[in-house]
Amino acid sequence: MYAIVEIAGKQFKVTKDLYIYTPKMDQEAGSSVSFDKILLLQNDQDIQVGDPTVAGAKIEGKVIEHVKGDKIIVFKRKRRKGYKTKQGHRQGYTKVLIQNILR
């Protein structure tokens, strides 16, 4: 059984007991979350496609931790002007364990 769910504008293919990294959420580590924007649900040869979402479907998960992604270097330079600047950026993510997919 798997589902395609939309979380914060991004789509994820999830199954039970799967860890996913979503854009940072406001929930604390250890709290439970539920997602109801299910776009597609597959269950034992039966596929339900939402219009735009599958009615009555829900995914339950648990927030494991908040992490930061790899560092990205932003470097700007203008030739012959002596202008250069260097910045770093690390995107915040939330690690979520998918516990259950409900119809």
From Swiss-Prot:
Keywords: Ribonucleoprotein, Ribosomal protein, RNA-binding, rRNA-binding
Superkingdom of origin: Bacteria
Paired cysteines (S-S): none
GO terms assigned for molecular function: rRNA binding; structural constituent of ribosome
GO CC terms in record: cytoplasm; ribonucleoprotein complex; ribosome
One Pfam family it belongs to: Ribosomal_L21p
InterPro entries: bL21-like (IPR028909), bL21-like_sf (IPR036164), Ribosomal_bL21 (IPR001787), Ribosomal_bL21_CS (IPR018258)
Any Gene Ontology biological process: translation
Keyword Ribosomal protein: yes
Record flagged with keyword Magnesium: no
Function statement: This protein binds to 23S rRNA in the presence of protein L20.
Family of the protein in this entry: Belongs to the bacterial ribosomal protein bL21 family.
Subunit and partners: Part of the 50S ribosomal subunit. Contacts protein L20.
Protein name according to UniProt: Large ribosomal subunit protein bL21
Source species taxonomy: Bacteria, Pseudomonadati, Bacteroidota, Cytophagia, Cytophagales
Gene of this entry: rplU
